[in-house]
Amino acid sequence: MVKKLNVQEMILTLQRFWSEKGCMLMQSYDTEKGAGTMSPYTFLRAIGPEPWNTAYVEPSRRPADGRYGENPNRLFQHHQFQVIMKPAPLNIQEFYLDSLRALGIDPLEHDIRFVEDNWENPSMGCAGVGWEVWLDGMEVTQFTYFQQVGGLQCDPVTSEITYGVERLASYIQDVDNVFDLEWGNGVLYGDIFKEPEYEHSKYAFEDSNQEMLLKFFDEYETEAKRLIDLGLVHPAYDYVLKCSHTFNLLDAHGAVSVTERAGYLSRIRRMAHSIAQAFVAEREKRGFPLLKHAQEAKTEVVDHD
């Protein structure tokens, strides 16, 4: 029987597990985004030759998915537990199954299926091969090998594991309504997030200032391009994230037509591609320092042996 960990305990267990596998524990990135993949800890670090292993929780905002806090499973904001390992370990799938064991879920006693589901995020120029992971009939994780990020080929290949925090917690706690989850210390998910869910949904669908958001998108785009020209990759990327979230708000409100939608996504994709190119060029100029660090660490291990 699965021990009913609260959300806090579940996250701590995953952090401890992946830390022991060599992942740095990062903190959530402080700009709105639609998925953990869009954090610079994934988007930027998945490209170029440098190794990168990290794990972090990322609140992910998807305005169109808001349901005023009335739907038991669909949310304006949900949480992802993101694991990035580059280069992808040969036994990454076994690592994942071991992480379920750490949560008290024995793969031999449950129906765990890897269902092919190749992934792409066209607006960010990202694509990969992967699987949805189903646990006793419920999708709880997305497992992806990145092939392309920011329009650049990934070499070496990066592996991404994205746990749906609310979904996995719902399974572990055996609840049908996400707002009934225990977050920690007896406090329910709904006590924390139900009111924000209602307010953000009302804003996205009814009360957002579309004229202002359209203006903001143009200004964010202009600033991102200016910063790219100045070689300020990280501030520029922040503005691309702002463009993406602003577009999502406009899209949720039905403020852009089908034709306009394609145009906005293309504008975001071009900026993301320019930033990816600039980031790799800057890292190369610095001699890819994390690659050197990994080689030195490997040499120290060999010398010690």
Swiss-Prot record:
<dbReference type="GO" id="GO:0004820">
    <property type="term" value="F:glycine-tRNA ligase activity"/>
</dbReference>
<keyword id="KW-0963">Cytoplasm</keyword>
<dbReference type="GO" id="GO:0005524">
    <property type="term" value="F:ATP binding"/>
</dbReference>
<keyword id="KW-0067">ATP-binding</keyword>
<dbReference type="InterPro" id="IPR045864">
    <property type="entry name" value="aa-tRNA-synth_II/BPL/LPL"/>
</dbReference>
<keyword id="KW-0547">Nucleotide-binding</keyword>
<keyword id="KW-0030">Aminoacyl-tRNA synthetase</keyword>
<dbReference type="GO" id="GO:0006426">
    <property type="term" value="P:glycyl-tRNA aminoacylation"/>
</dbReference>
<dbReference type="Pfam" id="PF02091">
    <property type="entry name" value="tRNA-synt_2e"/>
</dbReference>
<comment type="similarity">
    <text>Belongs to the class-II aminoacyl-tRNA synthetase family.</text>
</comment>
<dbReference type="InterPro" id="IPR006194">
    <property type="entry name" value="Gly-tRNA-synth_heterodimer"/>
</dbReference>
<dbReference type="GO" id="GO:0016740">
    <property type="term" value="F:transferase activity"/>
</dbReference>
<comment type="subunit">
    <text>Tetramer of two alpha and two beta subunits.</text>
</comment>
<dbReference type="GO" id="GO:0005829">
    <property type="term" value="C:cytosol"/>
</dbReference>
<dbReference type="InterPro" id="IPR002310">
    <property type="entry name" value="Gly-tRNA_ligase_asu"/>
</dbReference>
<keyword id="KW-0648">Protein biosynthesis</keyword>
<keyword id="KW-0436">Ligase</keyword>
<protein>
    <recommendedName>
        <fullName>Glycine--tRNA ligase alpha subunit</fullName>
        <ecNumber>6.1.1.14</ecNumber>
    </recommendedName>
</protein>
<dbReference type="GO" id="GO:0140096">
    <property type="term" value="F:catalytic activity, acting on a protein"/>
</dbReference>
